[in-house]
Each structure stands twice: as structure tokens, then as C-alpha cells.
Amino acid sequence: EKTALSDFDKRIVLRRLTAKNTEAFSVLRQAAEQPNFAEILSAFIDECRSFDISAAALQESAAILDEGVLKHKLTDIAFLYGKYEAYLEERFGSARDVFSALAEEAGKVDFLRDAHIWVDGFQWFTPRQLQVLKAIADVSEETVITLPMDPEHRTRQRRPTALYKRAFEAFEELSMLFPAIRVEIVPDYAASELRRFRDTFFAPVPETVKTPVQALQVCECTDRRVEVDAVARRIKTLVQAGRRYRDITVITRSSEPYSRLCERIFAEYDIPCFTDYRRPMHIHPLSEALTALLETVRLKWSQEALFRLLKTDLMPLERRETDDLELYCSAAGIRAYHWYKDEDWQRMPEGLENKGAGLVYINGIRKRVYDLLSPLWEAFAGTDSLRNFCTALWQWLEDAHIGKTLAAWQAEAQEAGCEEEAREHEQVWKKVISLLERLVVLCGDDEMSGAEFTDILTEGLEELHFTLIPPTADHVTVTSIERGYTSRSPVIFV
């Protein structure tokens, strides 16, 4: 079974290929050292693929240009593009992207033969996407494609400044691709007042009405909290009047600043809600523990990073032991190099004698921490394959019983009725292990330093997100404006 490469996968492959071939560049050698070079290059290659531009085509374009920076840039990019496709061909047996594979394989997929396909939310299509549409339409029972357009003034959309110019160009391309296309106009379900407001929005002199507009209410609030609180109170009023929570949608310009706020304030009003904001996993204790662990190893027992790791409660220490150890290290002036000296710590700071933190007790805690971290510290000290780094980290997770701890947390959350928290503990463990496995598949044999592996894994952890499901069938949906599928709700707060 073949899995499509994620954006993170592509960046890692391109980063490794760039590091191996830097000497072959003409002008991109300095740019290749920038942190976001792989991300920009990945986006450029994806764009080329979308428009059916191959590495060979880029090389041909560079060849006909006059001598200059652009010629050398295109040559370098075409070289990396070719290396990238060759790597995918060698490692995975095919350099095809998702759209290429879908266009070629659609005719072999049985369930498409009787399927009714709906394509919605597009204003234009790339050449590769048009190939996919053609392949699907050839085998499916019916293919319906929706485009936003003004049906009464369709020909006006040819103008360069027309609101629906891109959609009209897509319509003409589809008409050529599907000569037997049937055009239908979807009924406009918007309230007449909203429709008039929408249709005259870009007019030089907006239309005015003498009667109050009932379908649209505009309110002003001093800050986000007051804004969300007002929405919550209005929702309660609507529900008391007979509305269902599922009839109501809150649409925000950006999910991040509003999602947590809506969850907290709606909970105060006993309003069930579901936010489709993809929560990053870096806020989970396991992600924080791995980040702190790698920083501890990289910075040679950094005190700040070490105690961040210990305070995640994932290490086999009691919180009291962690606090006592931190208090001792601060009072005794313990530095990083004191951790890997052979002898026990001998100094007992004044004032700690009567706090139960005797030297035997403190050295016992220190030994447990050192014994757990030292194998990883030694493994990351030199250069090794990415596979061995991943194996060492996986072994550390096993030795620290991280999986068992998370399973216990999951069970406790389920017993307390916190299903969302329980799913988070389950998902984060599975996704971290999957990340390590994915890195081995992508570049397992690549030699690198411990610092390079730390950078790669840290970036991978930042890419992980929780996948959550609505807690109930009847709930208010909080989403961002980019997700237009929710705009059919009878009541919308923007």
C-alpha cells in the first residue's frame, strides 16, 4: 500500500537532497542554507506539477535563456527537481503525485463506475486537476461541478476586473473538456435582504432601503471576549425560542484566536460546541517532553530543559521528587557538567538539611534520571544514520514507559467522562510513533549529526495535529470563513 507524501515528508526529502548536492549549485548555494528553503522549493515543485511542468521542461527553458542569474537559478532548481523525482522513483517505485496517480488509476477503480461525484468549492482548475476531472467523469455515473457566477450577467465575466472572471474561465475550459456539458442554475436561497446587500456591495453608490433589515444584524463589541459572550447569550435565546444547536454556526476570520475562547465561554453557558480548528500537538506533555529531551541532550544537560522534561509528569519520578531535585540543584549551584561526573554530589546547602532532602535521597533521584537519559545522550553525541537515531529515541520511550503512562492517563480521562482528552492521549502516542516510522522510510539510511536529527524531529512534532470528532450530534459549530460548506446553517454569526 502506497501512502501519499505529506508536505512535511516532501520538505525532509528536499532538505536531505539539498544537503547532499550543495556543491553542484551555481547560484543557490547560499539560499539553500536558509531555514525555509526546502519549504519554498517544495511549494514550487508542487506548482510545477499542477501545471504539468517537468524537470526536463524547466531545464529546456533555462537552456534558451541568455546568460544571467535567472538561467542559473532555473538550472539549479531543475537539477534538484530531477533529483527529487529520481529519489521518489527509487525509494517508492513511482514519482507520481496524488493527482497524477488518480488521473491514471481512476479507470481501474470499481466503486467510481456507479458513483455520483460532486466537485464544490473551486473557482478555477489547474491542468492536472482538469485531467483528474476528465478521468473521473469518464467512469462515473454522474459528475457535477459547481462554480460561483452571476447567471444573469455571465458574458460580463470576460472583463479583466470581473468578480467571477476566474470562475468564468474555468467554465469555458470545462465546456471544451466536456462538449456534452449540461448547465443548470442552482436556486439562490439567500434571503431577499441579504441578496440585495450582496448584489450591490461593489456598486459605486450602494442601494439603501427605507425599512429595517431583519435578516442581518450588525453589532459592535469592545473585545473578543465580550463578542463571544454576546454570541453565547444570543444562542441561548434562540434555543429557548425553539432553535436547535445544530442550526447555528459561528464563522470566524481566523480559527486560532477564537476557538479556545468559544469553547471556554460556551461551556459557561452549557452550550455544546465543536471547533474544527486543528489543534497542534505541541501543547501535549509528550510533545513537550520530547522537545525538552532533545534540547537537554543537544545542550549537554541544560538545567532549564531538563526540568521542563521532568515536570511533564511523563518521567518515572514523583512530582515531589522533581521539586526536591530542582530545589537542591538551585541551592547547590549544580551545573550541566555536574550531571555526568562519576562521583556523587557531596555538598548539602545550608537550610536543606531539615527538609528531608538528604544527599542519599538526592543522589538516588539523580542516578535514576541519569541512567534514563545517558544512553540517549551518548547515542546523540556523534554522527549516525537517521534510522539509528529513531531507534534510540524509540528505545528511550520504551525504557521510560511513556506508552504505559499515556494509556493510564487515557483510562483516567475516560473514567472521568473526558472523552476528548482521552482521545488526545491515544492519538499523540500513535502519531509520534508513526512520525518515527515515517522518517525511517523517507531517509533512514542518511548519515547526520544528532543536532540535525533534533531539528528534523522538532519540525515533525510541530506538524502534528489532533483529529477530533464532535462530542454530540446537536452542537454549535465554530469554524473559519475558508470552510464555506457550513454557510448553509439557518443562523450564522460572523
Where are these predicted regions, by residue range?
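Polyanion-engaging groove/track-forming segments
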Residues: E1-V494
